[in-house]
Amino acid sequence: MVRPVQVGNKTRMSFAKIDEVLEMPDLIEVQKKSYKWFLEEGLREVFREISPIESFTGNLALEFVDYRLENNPKYSVEECKDRDTTYAVPMKVKVRLTNRETGEIKESEVFMGDFPLMTEKGTFIINGAERVIVSQLVRSPGVYYEQQFDKFGKKLISATVIPNRGAWLEYEEDSNDIVYVRIDRTRKVPITVLLRALGYSTDIQILDLLGEEEKLKATLDKDTTKSEEEALIEIYKRLRPGEPPTVESAKSLLYALFFDAKRYDLAKVGRYKFNKKLALKTRIANLKSAKKIVNPVTGEILVEEGEKISKEKAEEIQNCGINVVEVLVEGKVVKVIGNNTVDINKYPMPYDVSSLNIKEAVNLSVLKEILDNFSDEEAVINEIKNRMDELVPKHITKDDIIATISYQLNLTHGIGSIDDIDHLGNRRLRSVGELLQNQFRIGLARLERVVKERMTIQDVNEITPQNLINIRPVVAAIREFFGSSQLSQFMDQTNPLAELTHKRRVSALGPGGLSRERAGFEVRDVHYSHYGRICPIETPEGPNIGLIGSLTTYARVNEYGFIEAPYRRVDKTTGTVTDEIVYMTADEEDEYIIAQANEPLDENNRFINEKVVCRLKEEIIAVPPTEVDFMDVSPKQIVSVATSMIPFLENDDANRALMGSNMQRQAVPLIKPEAPIIGTGIEYKAAVDSGVVVLAKNDGVVEKVAADKVVIRTKDGRRDEYNLLKFKRSNQGTCINQRPIVNEGDEVKKGQVICDGPSTDYGELALGKNVLVGFMPWEGYNYEDAILISEELVRDDSLTSIHIEEYDAEARDTKLGPEEITREIPNVGEDALKDLDERGIIRIGAEVTAGDILVGKVTPKGETELTAEERLLRAIFGEKAREVRDTSLRVPHGESGIVVDVKVYSRENGDELPPGVNQMVRVFVAQKRKISVGDKMAGRHGNKGVISRILPVEDMPFLPDGTPLQICLNPLGVPSRMNIGQVLEVHLGLVAKALGWQIATPVFDGATEEDIQELLAKSGFSPDGKVQLYDGRTGEPFDNKVTVGYMYMLKLHHLVDDKMHARSTGPYSLVTQQPLGGKAQFGGQRFGEMEVWALEAYGAAHTLQEILTVKSDDVSGRVKTYEAIVKGENIPEPGIPESFKVLVKELQSLALDVKVITEDNQEIPLKEFEDDDDSDVPDATLNINIEGREDTPPEEVYEESYEEGFEEEIEELPEDIDFEPDSFDIENDDLDLEDFDI
């Protein structure tokens, strides 16, 4: 039943019944492997494609011979983050320039820009920010056939030939049996026109080629062209309408579109999919042959007439070089034409070419040519090497096109299969390496243009590779990709799980992928081929649902970009499950019958049940053990990492499991992390692979342990030093802090966890806290999923987290002179400067609140023209104090904390700074946030809620032994949500705490209800897991018993401190003059259309009037009102709202004559309310930016008006009113006349 299992440094009691046959792979291998491929092979491929670059005359050629990346980056990863630079190494390329006329060769090494490096953790540091490149799920290149039905129910077949890049070919049929082709999405032409253009010019040749097909005859009747030339011209007219067509230009266009490797690329995967789909062996298997089939090489009879062709025979027929087979279908003879490829290792020839390691099928005609011309084994092998691009062409071939047409015609007779484009056999992953390679290719293509131009312009004798090559386009392409591609994302670093999941994310969006609007239901849905590849649970809620997924725990990506899942092979002869692991792609898996991982086996690994429940494609079937081909490796293999961390997942509703998976990623790291009592056994693996913990590089003994450093003496006497990260800010503002968990003198093994990171506890992922919960209502504070918590959690800092904010101040050069960072700030008292050092920068350890100065900075003000007397006095008595204004960096509204770090960068010290910046100061302020009312918490089962009240410990309900509950949850949150996993977790948590166990209950293989009941009884609890509770206020028992136990609760990154916001005055929108909205803009609260209705319904006329005028966009009225409030006078009459003026202006712009008429038919001249604005109210002194000049920060408005002589007005205002708006991010101002914002 339960057995102890060692997990890292801990022992957990595991309920798993299934032994793990396969170790879980490295979870960020997707990223690392792909990038490694790019550096070693991807780059070489691109250089090989593009070289040589030849001049237009052909007498100069530039070749890229080799490349290398230097070993040492200029700065370490941490330094790059501090300095806002990119973690990169220089790339040097060896270039050879050949002058073919003189035979002169110049070779040199050219610098090709800095190339971003991937860190150990699978991320990139770009301009100091850690970013992740998300893998993209796209349609694989290949041939896809689908069927529709016309209005009479007739089956119409259409096909699409999709390359990696290049022109598409689309075939379609109409109800009259005519087959059309569209070339590159232009107007359609009969398919026979394309065949004629390819060289089959007469009707007889076409019918000979493809057989006497009804559809072909109907199409020939429709076809108006009668020769190759006419067909070429017809196609040219479609592709280039309006250009004068000639046969030559048509020929070269057709060649360029399909048969030029530079313009048309199938990629390795496209060639593989073509050969798989169009090969004879899959198409003729299990059909009857219409003629006897003879091996053309040996002359032996392979299949007699009328005999059924087996799978093995079909493969033999293809590999001996037969490309056309006639089969019988319902008495008709049908011609099946392959794409003329053979498996070179099985083709009957006297030479052994296995050493060449050619995996792809090769073009038969090229192979025959090689074999005819050479007779010596070595010569044959060399020739095969040299002509690899022809043997396995990257572009489409004539044979391919004919085979695709043949397949289309065969489908009418039911030969072949229709494709499902949502099947994972037809979708592939483009990971970092390939995305980067494509970007690099674009850069090199631009570089090629520049080089060709320069070759023609420059003097041939003076040319060197250096002055031919301009690296800017290459560098720009790479920079653009990392900086602004949709797939290059700012890493989600809230906690280690968020990091890990982000690197394993799979997105169907992005360039070359789908768009949210166009993606239909089918693409988003779970497909049976996702099994073991993409998690059916973890995907976002909202517009991206189903378009963004997550790789499952055991999935891996093969060389073609298809996702593979592992299976154990079953020995059919004995019915024994072996330990041999086979990785299969989705389309390979379709051919086999696969048993579940939890199918019971005896001690000899044989199936116990007489009927085994298995999967075959999308069906669930029961078969005898002898028919099973494979068995799942682990029950976890169908879900992602985050989902496999939910205990009792099998008892949760899928929608709630989805929320649970997503919310674990939002848990903030707590000060005292605590691993879950009820885990699933994957916590250790997740923490280690996320890269936040420190692992020992070698065996050894711990020599020294400090808070920020661990030293280990290895066996051979070397010292390994590990520097730890202390209180660093993550991308999301959470705290990254590592702490040692070993002591001096401890022996450590290689790969052992020696330091915990954020949200880890002895090497295990620890996202939350184990708290004592009771499912009971308490005075209505549980209404609508609200959570009642005990003050104990606040007092003990159980749910306290540290958040770090970063503030930057830059001293720039302005037109009036440089800004200066200084302690001498005008009009600021000494008490405001008490924590600044002599440079004017805050000291580390200072406690700051909103409005405090972090960095003192002054900016020069415009000098006024001096009179002659002043100039004279200036000359005699020396420089008067320079005119400067205070532009210090202050703590924004609502923020506070302790300064934990200050970094100063300046030009003088040789730091790299942006142009125009002389000095930069970066201040880090840390906040300790205790759990508070309004914070969001959640369990792991999608059970989320907001804290409604924090109750004193003595008022909380308590257990018979006096232990008070820590949290009360609403029992009504369970039944309708159907996430029963939380109840089982609570019961098991109660027992585990009593026994002092840590438990592992893996998904789909965990503790059962019986196990839990047995343990409850063993520990002396009631079998229903309920306990009598007592009211903390009165001490009286509650009427009913209550389910009590330990649940793992997370504090989520939706904290009330980040959402609280209040405004008195602040920025206004430019056109409507209404306050902006949102906390970031320091905006007001929107009083929308429906809210106005509510006031109208109650006849609250005065309230309504002031909301629509002085509280919103009556420009002069609001200033007068503010002044009236400050001076304690009565509020004046409202004026005319700005929106009304805008409306009038809009109507006038439509050339309408607008008149404003009062109740008693008096016309108000429109002039009047335009003069309103020139009121005598000193609006600027109140920093109510009336002209809506959002380009001027508030300080500047204030200063200008100050000079205009409003001193006395200002003195009357009380000191404690703060007019400083938070920030001036102006959103686009949409005019909505029905809604007024206040």
UniProtKB/Swiss-Prot annotation:
CDD domains: RNA_pol_B_RPB2
Annotated gene: rpoB
Protein name: DNA-directed RNA polymerase subunit beta
Subunit structure comment from the entry: The RNAP catalytic core consists of 2 alpha, 1 beta, 1 beta' and 1 omega subunit. When a sigma factor is associated with the core the holoenzyme is formed, which can initiate transcription.
NCBIfam families associated with the record: PRK00405.1, rpoB
Entry GO MF terms: DNA binding; DNA-directed RNA polymerase activity; ribonucleoside binding
Membership in a protein family: Belongs to the RNA polymerase beta chain family.
GO BP terms, alphabetized: DNA-templated transcription
Catalytic activity: RNA(n) + a ribonucleoside 5'-triphosphate = RNA(n+1) + diphosphate
Role of this protein: DNA-dependent RNA polymerase catalyzes the transcription of DNA into RNA using the four ribonucleoside triphosphates as substrates.
EC number(s) stated in the UniProt entry for this protein: 2.7.7.6
Keywords: DNA-directed RNA polymerase, Nucleotidyltransferase, Transcription, Transferase
A Pfam short name: RNA_pol_Rpb2_45
Feature: compositional bias, Acidic residues: 1193-1238
Leading EC class: transferase
Gene Ontology CC terms, in alphabetical order: DNA-directed RNA polymerase complex
Renumbered residue ranges of the record's region Disordered: 1187-1238
InterPro entries per the UniProt record, alphabetical: DNA-dir_RNA_pol_bsu_external_1, DNA-dir_RNA_pol_su2, DNA-dir_RNAP_su2_dom, DNA-dir_RNAP_su2_hyb_sf, RNA_pol_bsu_bac, RNA_pol_bsu_CS, RNA_pol_bsu_protrusion, RNA_pol_Rpb2_2
